[in-house]
Amino acid sequence: MTPADLAQLLKATAAAVLAEHGLDSAALPDTVTVERPRNPEHGDYATNLALQLGKKVGANPRELAGWLAEALAASDGIAAADVAGPGFVNLRIEASAQNVMVSNVLSAGADYGHSAVLAGKKVNLEFVSANPTGPIHIGGTRWAAVGDALGRLLTTQGAAVTREYYFNDHGAQIDRFSNSLIAAAKGEPAPEDGYAGTYIADIASQVVAKEPGVLDQPDDRMRETFRAIGVNLMFDHIKESLHEFGTDFDVYTHEDSMHTSGRVEQAIDKLRETGFAYEKDGAVWLRTTDFGDDKDRVVIKSDGKPAYIAGDLAYFLDKRKRGFDLCIYMLGADHHGYIARLKASAAALGDDPDTVEVLIGQMVNLVRDGQPVRMSKRAGTVITLDDLVEAIGVDAARYSLIRSSVDTPIDIDLELWSSASNENPVYYVQYAHARLSALARNAAELGIAPDTAHLDLLTHDKEGVLIRNIGEFPRILATAAELREPHRVSRYLEDLAGDYHRFYDACRVLPQGDEAPGDLHAARLALCAATRQVIANGLDILGVSAPERM
């Protein structure tokens, strides 16, 4: 009996109980859930359904809980049902009923935990989208990890996800980048508002190598040469860094294309059609205050040049024309004001604001020896993706960035995350997988194979805890996808790894000495194989390796 099976049983039982006592069964929620109690002594699962229904149906919640408990206790697979507190029902599942979860995992394999709840949903997931003026900084690195994990997570629920990088190659920052390259190529100091760091000198040298006479060109042509070649070289480095980090994109959209293809003008025309654009002081404005923004925004400035939001409008319209049902934007902490702006843009273009979701990520700080690490040797300013990977490796970097909710600032202790200790969360989870892999190899050498024929022998408390936890995996994925919170997967894996280590310490899996292999050994091996599969599935969603040996 899986948690989903138990929830269905609970809903059906509640409907029958309400009908029996002349109460309105229409008060039942569409979705009924069960939870694992924090204290295992309270039971295997618990529900507060009686508390939810009491006031709605005019019944005392504790009395209603008693009726529910009595009916559930008589159901197949339920060992006990007890009322607790003001109206909770604690449930214990018969071992024979819960052990089916082991077989479910082994049958589904790499697909265990997946669902079709988002089937038919076409999602555009835009993240990182760093300017091509320097290496990806640590904040963008957080999105590279979290965004990729979220894309994998949504895919497990059936969504068709397109990972997109919006390439900001239009505007003043590109001019400053070009001027910085020219200064470096001439051996001059960086402009006051320019970019510094060894990467600028490296790219400038590469531009000169590709175009030997570039410094002799007229200023406008020279600036354009450094801009075009320099931006491409920088973006090649960004894509290479992301690929080595395990993050790849399906689509790269150039901001400049929004302006050169006429799509900005098309978006402005659309705004005028819907009545949300107006002219004032020689500029074109968007009525974003109608949708919660603190002030209306200029779309076309009085000098005729498009404001930054003009590209955003054209870009959103472009996404919707490509057929996306949902557009998720992952932005940095300094972009909080964009939430209302993007939703207003959608509404102003005649769309539903709910087709836009904006996730805001908070700051990331690195710590070494108790002191903050602030400077990058290559970038000359902020810490970069490459710096983090060099310090702790790809797996630890991804896991450390995904592990916390994105709306929480995080400190990454470089010593902790590079250590081979149980205090290192990614090591703790990966070690559980490696330990399970070693166990499988040892069993194979002894000629013992996992067998689900005798799962009824798995009656130890630690076995039950482990079985129930692997049964939680589908719900964890569904919740994490719905809330856009991949950190829930990493926290779950740490909990599961802990349950496995405690099980292994309490329950001998393989025979020792002259002991003959038995059905219990084979059943425990099946449980271990299922646990290993779930850990591997979870790590895959995070983009973290599941090592066979450590």
From Swiss-Prot:
Subunit comment:
Monomer.
Using the chain's own numbering, where are the disulfide bonds? none
Supply the alphabetized keyword list.
Aminoacyl-tRNA synthetase, ATP-binding, Cytoplasm, Ligase, Nucleotide-binding, Protein biosynthesis
- Kindly list the GO CC terms recorded for this protein: cytoplasm
Enzyme class, spelled out: ligase
The EC number of this protein is 6.1.1.19
Motif 'HIGH' region, residue numbers: 130-140
Q: What is the lineage of its organism?
A: Bacteria, Bacillati, Actinomycetota, Actinomycetes, Mycobacteriales
A GO MF term: ATP binding
- Predominant localisation class: cytoplasm
Which terms under GO biological process does the entry name?
Answer: arginyl-tRNA aminoacylation
Q: Catalytic activity, per the record? A: tRNA(Arg) + L-arginine + ATP = L-arginyl-tRNA(Arg) + AMP + diphosphate
Q: What is the protein name given in its UniProt record? A: Arginine--tRNA ligase
List the source organism: Mycolicibacterium gilvum (strain PYR-GCK) (Mycobacterium gilvum (strain PYR-GCK))
Query: What PANTHER family does the database record attribute to this sequence?
Result: ARGININE--TRNA LIGASE, CYTOPLASMIC, ARGINYL-TRNA SYNTHETASE
